[in-house]
Curated annotation (Swiss-Prot):
This is Thiamine-phosphate synthase. 4-amino-2-methyl-5-(diphosphooxymethyl)pyrimidine binds at residues 42-46, 77, 116, 146. It is an enzyme of class 2 (transferase). GO terms for cellular component: cytoplasm.
Amino acid sequence: MTLKFEPTQLRAYFVCGTQDVPGQDLNMVVQTALDAGVTAFQYRDKGNSQLTTVERFALGQQLRERCAQAHVPFIVDDDVELALALQADGIHVGQKDDWVTQVIQRVANQMFVGLSCSTLAEVQIANQLEGIAYLGSGPIFPTTSKADADPVVGLTGLRQLVMTASCPVVAIGGITVAQLPAIAATGAAGAAVISMLTRSPDMAATVKAMLTATEGH
């Protein structure tokens, strides 16, 4: 049974793949994050990942089950076939991936769809589409986690995107704990992070800071 999308799922959104935690067991990293209280998990295994297609699917099955047990949405990045095979709760696509309308048609009524938007023009186009649950906007700050990241948006740019968007926006890119209140003040529904959690010495405290920042917004 897939979970329906709720804006509160964006409050503490964890994005991760094997390439982000070299030498570590991604299963254990994700379980620690789930125990800490993350509100969504995106399986983004790409870039420097060494996994084969079969290995990526097998690991995805394990992660999907962990998320299901925690009642946290399991979201697959980019890969429609993988998302369908794993019966994911959601799929996140970028502007350069399969055109989002095709993705929406493929996964209709099976999972929710998130779309990366980093410019006002992209948000305005997304507003015209049926079937977009949320937008991922950024990078808000410079990031080292994505080699193909778009130009930095900044807090002012994020506020404009949030005001323009007709669905919830989650901020992504180069975010630190200290910046969480300022991000929440823009009206963003939450933050999507990779290294802020994978490199955290205390993941529970970091997730708590993410949740605290979005209280009352």
